[in-house]
């Protein structure tokens, strides 16, 4: 056999093999690679979107947490203000009632003082009348008068 003829035959067989591969084997392989590349790109895009969505969800959660904390602080502040207002109102009401009680007690004391004064006046008048009667009934004697006045003074 001649090397040239063998070489020529192998070249033709190789060309047929290359043509067969290019016609029947290569298109499905390239199509499979393109589909796989497309799936990988879609997966990467989906992962990127999921990461962005996760980041947005975390930001929203953090924002909601801040807003909730602010609302809780506002509610506590309002509750404290309301409690302080109630306490101040109760203090004012207690002061008012205390002042009313003090005024009532002072009025009652004044009334009792006036009653006591009236009773004392009545007693002094009775004593004066009694003293005058005793002075008039007894004889005019300076020492006796002085004794009667001393007795009157001790009774007052």
Swiss-Prot record:
PANTHER family: ATP SYNTHASE SUBUNIT B (PTHR33445:SF1), ATP SYNTHASE SUBUNIT B', CHLOROPLASTIC (PTHR33445). The gene is atpF. F-type ATPases have 2 components, F(1) - the catalytic core - and F(0) - the membrane proton channel. F(1) has five subunits: alpha(3), beta(3), gamma(1), delta(1), epsilon(1). F(0) has three main subunits: a(1), b(2) and c(10-14). The alpha and beta chains form an alternating ring which encloses part of the gamma chain. F(1) is attached to F(0) by a central stalk formed by the gamma and epsilon chains, while a peripheral stalk is formed by the delta and b chains. F(1)F(0) ATP synthase produces ATP from ADP in the presence of a proton or sodium gradient. F-type ATPases consist of two structural domains, F(1) containing the extramembraneous catalytic core and F(0) containing the membrane proton channel, linked together by a central stalk and a peripheral stalk. During catalysis, ATP synthesis in the catalytic domain of F(1) is coupled via a rotary mechanism of the central stalk subunits to proton translocation. Component of the F(0) channel, it forms part of the peripheral stalk, linking F(1) to F(0). Gene3D superfamilies: F1F0 ATP synthase subunit B, membrane domain (1.20.5.620). The chain crosses the membrane at residues 7-29. GO terms for cellular component: plasma membrane; proton-transporting ATP synthase complex. HAMAP family: ATP_synth_b_bprime. Pfam families: ATP-synt_B (PF00430). One of its GO terms (molecular function) is proton-transporting ATPase activity, rotational mechanism. Coiled coil: none annotated. It is a single-pass membrane protein. It comes from the Bacteria. This is ATP synthase subunit b. The keyword Ion transport applies. Keywords: ATP synthesis, Cell inner membrane, Cell membrane, CF(0), Hydrogen ion transport, Ion transport, Membrane, Transmembrane, Transmembrane helix, Transport. Belongs to the ATPase B chain family. It is found in: Cell inner membrane.
